[in-house]
Amino acid sequence: MKKNYLLLYFIFLLCGSIAAQDWNGIPVPANPGNGMTWQLQDNVSDSFNYTSSEGNRPTAFTSKWKPSYINGWTGPGSTIFNAPQAWTNGSQLAIQAQPAGNGKSYNGIITSKNKIQYPVYMEIKAKIMDQVLANAFWTLTDDETQEIDIMEGYGSDRGGTWFAQRMHLSHHTFIRNPFTDYQPMGDATWYYNGGTPWRSAYHRYGCYWKDPFTLEYYIDGVKVRTVTRAEIDPNNHLGGTGLNQATNIIIDCENQTDWRPAATQEELADDSKNIFWVDWIRVYKPVAVSGGGNNGNDGATEFQYDLGTDTSAVWPGYTRVSNTTRAGNFGWANTNDIGSRDRGASNGRNNINRDINFSSQTRFFTQDLSNGTYNVLITFGDTYARKNMNVAAEGQNKLTNINTNAGQYVSRSFDVNVNDGKLDLRFSVGNGGDVWSITRIWIRKVTSNSANLLAAKGLTLEDPVETTEFLYPNPAKTDDFVTVPNSEIGSSIIIYNSAGQVVKKVSVVSENQKISLEGFAKGMYFINLNGQSTKLIVQ
């Protein structure tokens, strides 16, 4: 009998796992970019395959959502945001509107406990209610100055059909005091469904928040609207930053009587027409196909970050980190007093080194990852000279007294053991230094194969790779070769790939031997000269 119970238990677990992602098999319609793929952000994604009600909220709900607004505001017009009107029935989220008396309504709402930030794709599958109320899937920053409306629909339109047949796709930028509101206007913000009311069926509503100045809207997997820089913040409410802040996700319904007709108490009491049904919500980040640029603790073994501003260029395959990137799966634990600059591409600077994060304060960068040994490469430098920059990892000093001249970029790497699922990197400045300044963080798991290869080449995992490490492209060059200094004429240079295979052999004819990199795929190689080896990283 016990075996039968166990069998039923495992079947239950299996069914729960299968149902956990109701969107399986539905591709993300947005393009993540060359060499990139979509990675699910589980902490803000939900199939709602559990029961939840006020006073009975399971961890599946409370770990991700709260049934209230981001602050104490109770809603627009005749709205009263109220927790009992947000519930789940085992397969869907219900956002309900019910009569509150005196012409007002109790309205359901949920707000994410975890924030999202571009680049990110977010989508729900939902069916709006048959009411004059607004049904909305949107995002809002803590300071309430930046809002993205992925969808805002009105299920019925008393006296006409115009609103019922159109879906509002928009965004807002605000000044809070004195209150000033901008949102784009015109027919392009109201997507027409060919005459069919949106309330008649479930639809998928998505938005790719690509960067601070680009929004792509999708309905049922089709791109229906793109918003670019000219429309994002033409009145400069945000001081030129665009939609750049980390933001909460909100799903709610609203009785917007400040500009819409009010729902009657009788209409609100009709349970067949007063529920905004949400089947699921899914959120994705673009990450490198190879694992480079990945940012979650899902077994990825490589994480590549290009540090800069919210809008500066990002090296292909890398993920942006700005001075406002707060630690979630990755980022700064404290963003106070961290600056960012884009120095431009003059003097041959490439997109890795043109932009930086910097600070005079000690700051921690964290990365969620699986336990193991990792090689961490950091690129230091700026258009100004920097002194005595230091890095510690997992509480151990790894790099000290790193100095760079004006316009010089230096890469240093080290290995570190992680046993708590999170890598902590501490950046600081020693005596005589003003700020630390970095352009890149590259984290790669060290496998047993790579350890054996290093040992075979006369290196150990503990050996620091300092001036003997090459990076291609060179920060100030774009030629398709690297130069190996102090080469012995008549000897041979052998290049191995990370699997230990010989990929090139060159006879040395110059003390500064040039090696062509034509045909080299991106990755890590090892240059061997007279028994001495060094890394070559081709990007």
Swiss-Prot record:
Region annotated Disordered, chain positions: 332-353
Active site, per annotation: 147, 152
GO MF, one annotated term: beta-agarase activity
Alphabetically ordered keywords of this record: Glycosidase, Hydrolase, Secreted, Signal
GO cellular component: extracellular region
InterPro entries, sorted: AGA-YXIM_GBD (IPR049033), Beta_agarase (IPR016287), ConA-like_dom_sf (IPR013320), Galactose-bd-like_sf (IPR008979), GH16 (IPR000757), Secre_tail (IPR026444)
Localization annotation: Secreted
Coiled-coil blocks: none
Recorded family membership: Belongs to the glycosyl hydrolase 16 family.
Assembly and oligomerization: Monomer.
Name the UniProt record assigns to this protein: Beta-agarase A
